[in-house]
Design a protein with these regions (language model features):
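N-terminal lobe/hinge region of extracytoplasmic solute-binding protein
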Residues: 105-155, 162, 185, 196, ...
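Alpha-helical secondary-structure segments
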Residues: 177-183, 211-215, 266, 296-299, ...
Length: 630
């Protein structure tokens, strides 16, 4: 299945074989019809913000280019965009291509092949090709079956998973319930950096060879999403090689599972790998997902290159084909280079402004009359003073305007929530006067200078915007590593932070940022010290509600409160960007994790000038890898 995006419109389809039409099977999936040889079929196209439509997809026998017939009532631009999307996807996989090497570079080094040893998202993006989970994300961010063929909720705290039969590990061993039980218990054990995600799991029970029950302490409606990162290992292989425990993932670390792998995924690790060396992945010819490998990338060679400049030079010299963690400041220049293609899409991270709404007075500021951020009118006035067009311009369009604290694609997001109020200085000044701050006040803005694309420039742009309503801002520019402890110790009055949704659900955003802070994990980054009983009740209900429709409604109500109370000021949703040779056909997935089974490598690689890749002033900073969600 291929997912493509253009002009904000998303289409999902499988490839088209000669003489095989499509028929509709699910809302976001096309499947080859059993009536092969007929000329016509129906396909399903999902449009962002629009109802589903079913265009005709015609792929006659003996032809190499399908025709797409779209409803005549659609606007011309929409018809052109959708036709281009579908043809790109259909043509991309219509003709089988011979295997071709794909060389992939990123900043993060793989120090262990143990799927339970490193929580870093880039490491998991690589190891997902080798080790699989019970569930996975579809290109449309829906949870779909992987090693589990189906599942159901037996009671509010017991989930039953039925394993897919016929699945084999790379060494030929069959997948059993014993392997799943062992893997989930291993993941929760000592040494695992991923164990916290299963903190609410009480036990894993084997029902038979292909059925398990996961018993929880409390209802956990997100369990199928959480399990997408719970990789399954072979128990017998682990026991034979004394790899039943997770060893710390450090350079030079020992342990059989550190240097060897035995998963069920579409790729397997080539022999001879050791930490510090490029990791070569070879196609698994016995993968269970027949027809799920439309690409031709084989082998895939992953190489860690720490320096941004070195990664881009390697791309220019033709030494690598794909770079997936670029500094956003480089994107405008890279888009102008003829030898490369840059793909961008909105990520799951949102930049926002937070304010201390608890203290009686500002620790870093001067107002003359208490803490102005405790007044919703002041917070609302600050939001009305922000000019989104200016922010987009100074950030090289590497952001998308945001009206809520979660990004598009995250469960709970709606277009209405994400709609920003227009800049209105007159109304903002009126609100400031009503709150008793017509003369304004002084405050310090803590701003990271090495974490997000154009982070300091965005902070600098906010200064004159807020000055127009009397708020005099001084910027405290500091590394991201210094900002985090300030927030953890409540040592800030005003700050900018980015926050993401690794499980594509708004609950963790709300729990971390807006839930009343306590001695427990709840409200960990609620440095604003928001404490709203109604908001807390909605979050608690969403945390334990197993009905997905009702639960999404609860999340949307909670996000509406955050928006109307101006508890945070959303600035923008960050864009993600990958750069690759023009010989590479790859669409950036919303998950930000490339699936190499979809990649098609064609033609010859073209280089670009080294001068064009030089870092611009103030933009060549290396952004450190941080937590998944900040």
């Amino acid at each position: 299945m291929l997912a493509l995006r253009r002009n904000g419109i998303r289409a999902v389809s499988t490839h088209c074989n000669h003489g095989q039409p499509f028929m509709t099977t699910r809302a976001t999936q096309l499947k080859v019809s059993p009536l092969a040889g007929k000329r016509h079929g129906k396909g399903c196209l999902r449009l962002k913000g629009m109802p589903l439509e079913y265009p005709d997809l015609v792929c006659s026998a003996g032809t190499s280019r399908p025709r797409v017939s779209l409803p005549t009532g659609w606007p011309t631009r929409l018809r052109r965009t959708c036709r281009a999307l579908l043809l790109a996807g259909l043509m991309g996989a219509a003709l089988p291509a011979s295997a071709a090497t794909l060389r992939w570079a990123a900043q993060t080094e793989i120090t262990s092949l143990d799927p339970h040893a490193q929580a870093h998202p880039q490491v998991q993006a690589v190891l997902q090709h080798v080790y699989e989970s019970l569930t996975r994300y579809s290109p449309g961010l829906e949870v779909e079956p992987a090693l589990a063929q189906r599942w159901e909720l037996l009671t509010p705290v017991i989930w039953r998973f039925h394993l897919r039969q016929g699945v084999r590990f790379h060494d030929g061993s069959p997948l059993t319930a014993e392997d799943v039980q062992f893997s989930l218990e291993r993941l929760k054990g000592a040494g695992s950096t991923l164990g916290t995600m299963l903190a609410g799991v009480r036990s894993v029970r084997r029902i038979d060879e292909h059925t398990i029950d996961i018993v929880l302490d409390k209802p956990m409606p997100l369990l199928p999403r959480i399990l997408t990162d719970a990789r399954i290992m072979n128990r017998r292989w682990s026991r034979t090689h004394r790899a039943e425990a997770v060893l710390a993932s450090k350079p030079g670390g020992s342990g059989y599972a550190t240097r060897n792998a035995n998963g069920t995924g579409p790729y397997r690790v080539a022999e001879g790998w050791a930490p510090g060396l490029p990791l070569q992945l070879e196609r698994n010819p016995d993968w269970w997902n027949t027809g799920g490998f439309p690409g031709n990338a084989d082998p895939v060679i992953y190489q860690a290159i720490a320096s941004d400049d070195d990664r881009l030079r390697a791309l220019e010299r033709g030494e690598v084909d794909l770079v997936t963690d670029l500094p956003g400041q480089r994107i405008p220049a890279l888009k102008r280079l003829p030898g490369l293609q840059v793909q961008t899409d909105v990520s799951q991270r949102t930049l926002l402004i937070g304010m201390d709404q608890f203290s009686d007075s500002l620790r870093y500021g001067h107002t003359g009359m208490g803490n102005p951020f405790r007044d919703q009118r002041v917070r609302h006035a600050m939001a009305l003073a922000i000019n989104e067009r200016t922010l987009m311009r100074i950030s090289g369009n590497m952001y998308q305007p945001a009206g809520t604290i979660v990004a598009p694609g995250v469960n709970g997001w709606t277009e209405a929530l994400d709609r920003r109020e227009a800049t209105n200085l007159r109304q903002a000044r009126q609100l400031m006067a009503q709150a008793g701050h017509a003369a304004g006040f002084e405050v310090t803005l803590d701003c990271p200078n090495n974490r997000y694309a154009y982070d300091q420039q965005i902070c600098e742009a906010l200064v004159p915007m807020w000055a127009r309503i009397g708020i005099r801002v001084k910027i405290n520019s500091l590394p991201f590593a210094s900002l985090v402890p300030k927030l953890e110790t409540l040592d800030s009055s005003l700050w900018m932070l980015g926050w993401g949704s690794p499980d594509f659900d708004a609950l963790q955003n709300l729990l971390s940022l807006a839930y009343t802070r306590s001695d427990k994990v709840d409200g960990t980054y609620n440095a604003a010290r928001i404490s709203d009983p109604k908001l807390d009740r909605l979050i608690d209900q969403a945390r334990y509600e197993n009905n997905p429709i009702k639960r999404t409604g609860l999340l949307q109500q909670a996000l509406e409160i955050v928006k109307t109370q101006s508890y945070y000021l959303p600035l923008a949703h960050a864009m993600r960007a990958w750069v690759m040779q023009r010989s590479i056909s790859l669409v950036v997935p919303p998950s930000e994790r490339p699936e190499m089974r979809f990649v098609i490598v064609t033609g010859r690689r073209a280089g670009v000038s080294d001068t064009a890749l030089a870092a611009p002033d103030r933009a060549g900073r290396n952004q450190p890898a941080g937590a998944q969600n900040k």
